[in-house]
């Protein structure tokens, strides 16, 4: 980054008094520099963060990016396996999404990393080799499952509900067995992704709960030590999480972790996030966590495909800068830690989904996105998701929210995972 960045130098005497979002109040002096360094970050210590607190990253797109020619570096500017770089920065858990069959009838990938079980194994083995546990995130769809769509896998489309239950159980168990056989250290399994209003093509909560239990049963039978997580979103909507948690309880759904997405520009205040997660934990005895979060460090687009943030109408509670990004991540960690012992941790979503090439070479980028699935969706996804991917396919929509710059070098904000444990005051230079 060549633009000038403000650096804040906080005196130790005011360390305990300043809030993370109010770090400007602790300024001793201000200095303009050409580039922010990791040692220049101000990160207030997160109180209540135990040694097992999850500091996770979802890097599901990484294989497709590397196949597209993307190279990642360490903090010294040397080429290095990104999983080693993440580990050195304090990341201790890797999340990977799994789609049933993200390919068309000719074998062309839908994009978004083309994340099938085999990709999950590749990613999982590299994470395990670097001493990180793995969260297997089953979407139970052939492409993106989120609040707007929970499309049933093509192969399950004509099944009866009872047959679908059997297939979900079988698919989950067989996939986990494959991953474990390959040496992947799975610590947690997500049965569904952002299943706020649907799951595997079902929208009736009674049926959804039965499907949740089939996935959970498969996990329990595979390894009883693996945590079962259910994942929802929109914590800002009044009464949503209390309704979901109560419904799960009434339907006797077997799970360990109530997980939420939390994006600062969409999902309300951190105080509310803590409140709704704490209520679930205290009322139903569940562990809680944030399964997805991220924030912008620049308003610039890197690859010629538009980004999800910033957009008009969004609330951006932190500066759009490397320091603002680090503070945003730190504050989400604090929000989860503030739920008490039930708070497991936080996963950053796609911190490495950077451009496959500069936006000035967008035509070349398009070829790479189509060939390797390194964009959020390829044109081939139109047969499965014609209304969304079929119209808006293209590159990375979050390259300006990555924790690596557009050329694959780690941003100083990547160090927030380790700085949050003890806090960090920048040194003058």
From Swiss-Prot:
Cofactor(s), names only, from the UniProt record: Ca(2+)
Active-site annotation: 194, 292
Leader sequence segment: 1-21
InterPro entries according to UniProt: Glyco_hydro_53 (IPR011683), Glycoside_hydrolase_SF (IPR017853)
Pfam families reported in the protein's UniProt record: Glyco_hydro_53
EC numbers, comma separated: 3.2.1.-, 3.2.1.89
Coiled-coil spans in chain: none
Keyword match Hydrolase: yes
PROSITE patterns according to UniProt: PROKAR_LIPOPROTEIN
Induction remark: Repressed by the transcriptional regulator GanR and induced by galactobiose. Also repressed by glucose.
Molecular function terms from GO: arabinogalactan endo-1,4-beta-galactosidase activity; glucosidase activity; metal ion binding
Cofactor binding description: Binds 1 Ca(2+) ion per subunit.
Activity's dependence on pH: Optimum pH is 6.5 with AZCL galactan as substrate.
Major enzyme class: hydrolase
Example of a GO biological process term: pectin catabolic process
Reported temperature dependence: Optimum temperature is 50 degrees Celsius with AZCL galactan as substrate.
UniProt family annotation: Belongs to the glycosyl hydrolase 53 family.
Official protein name in the record: Endo-beta-1,4-galactanase
Source species taxonomy: Bacteria, Bacillati, Bacillota, Bacilli, Bacillales
This protein's encoding gene: ganB
């Amino acid at each position: 980054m060549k633009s000038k960045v403000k650096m804040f130098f906080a005196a130790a005497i005011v360390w305990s008094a300043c809030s993370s979002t109010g770090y400007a109040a602790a300024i001793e002096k201000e200095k303009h520099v050409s580039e922010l360094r990791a040692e220049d970050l101000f990160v207030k210590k997160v109180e209540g963060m135990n040694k097992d607190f999850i500091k996770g990253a979802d890097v599901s797109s990484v294989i497709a990016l590397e196949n597209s020619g993307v190279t990642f570096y360490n903090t010294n500017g040397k080429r290095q396996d990104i999983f080693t770089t993440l580990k050195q920065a304090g990341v201790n858990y890797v999340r990977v999404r799994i789609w049933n069959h993200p390919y068309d009838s000719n074998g062309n990938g839908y994009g978004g990393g083309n994340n099938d079980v085999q990709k999950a194994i590749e990613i999982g083995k590299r994470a395990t080799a670097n001493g990180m546990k793995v969260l297997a995130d089953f979407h139970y769809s052939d492409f993106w499952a989120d609040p707007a769509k929970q499309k049933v896998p093509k192969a399950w489309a004509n099944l009866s509900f009872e047959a679908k239950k059997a297939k979900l159980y079988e698919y989950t168990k067989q996939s986990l067995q494959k991953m474990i056989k390959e040496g992947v250290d799975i610590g947690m399994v997500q049965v569904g992704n952002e299943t706020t209003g649907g799951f595997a093509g079902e929208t009736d909560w009674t049926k959804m709960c039965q499907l949740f239990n089939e996935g959970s049963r498969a996990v329990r039978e595979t390894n009883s030590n693996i945590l079962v997580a259910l994942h929802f979103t929109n914590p800002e909507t009044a009464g949503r999480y209390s309704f979901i948690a109560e419904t799960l309880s009434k339907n006797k759904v077997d799970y360990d972790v109530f997980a939420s997405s939390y994006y600062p520009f969409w999902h309300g205040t951190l105080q509310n996030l803590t409140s709704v997660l704490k209520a679930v934990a205290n009322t139903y005895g569940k562990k809680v966590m944030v399964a997805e979060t991220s924030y912008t460090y620049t308003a610039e687009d890197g690859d010629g495909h538009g980004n999800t943030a910033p957009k008009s109408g969004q609330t951006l509670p932190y500066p759009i800068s490397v320091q603002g990004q680090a503070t945003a991540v730190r504050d989400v960690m604090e929000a989860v830690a503030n739920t008490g012992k039930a708070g497991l941790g936080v996963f950053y979503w796609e911190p490495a989904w950077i451009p496959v090439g500069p936006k000035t070479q967008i035509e070349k980028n398009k070829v790479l996105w189509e060939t390797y699935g390194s964009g959020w969706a390829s044109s081939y996804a139109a047969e499965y998701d014609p209304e969304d991917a079929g119209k808006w396919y293209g590159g990375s929509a979050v390259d300006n929210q990555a924790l690596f710059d557009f050329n694959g070098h780690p941003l100083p904000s990547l160090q927030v995972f380790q700085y949050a444990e003890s806090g960090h005051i920048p040194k003058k230079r």
